[in-house]
Amino acid sequence: AFVIPAGQADMTRVAFVADVLIAQGIELGRTRGEVKIGDLAFPAGSLVVRLDQPYGRLAKILLEKQDFPDPNLRTYDDSGWTMGLLTHTEVKPVADKAILAVPTDPVDRFTAKGRVDGKGEGAGWIAAAANGSANLVSLRFELRSMDVHAASKAFAAGDTRLPAGSLLIEVRGAA
């Protein structure tokens, strides 16, 4: 199987990979709790892609890292098949068959969920972390009528570290 761990920095990339797999007919399961298999640990909500399914071979092709056995005989391929590398999404192969016994719920559509940290009391700014997501461009477009700034260097807001390029949106009239 392959596991796509929950809690990655940009879950919209995970959503993209999951949606591509689902569109191909590949079955995904979301873990109900934390998973520990040998030295590997995955948080609750991780996605399990079993290879013992009708489209298991396709899942393997899309998720497995391509290895060329002889660097002098590299074949030309105008397609990229390693979804994790293409999308900067962590995808872990798991050879231990114990992964097949992990309780999961079927996933028909994956939706990335954001979060808001802080209580909002006295908050005058909302920050959107610059984690490389193409969705920041869409966010910036949707907020075109608002004052949106980009952080010129990394900074911390409470316990949260935000990289340079993070969007800062002023919230006027915040309580």
Residue ranges of model-derived segments:
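Intrinsic-disorder/low-complexity accessory segments
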Residues: 1-175
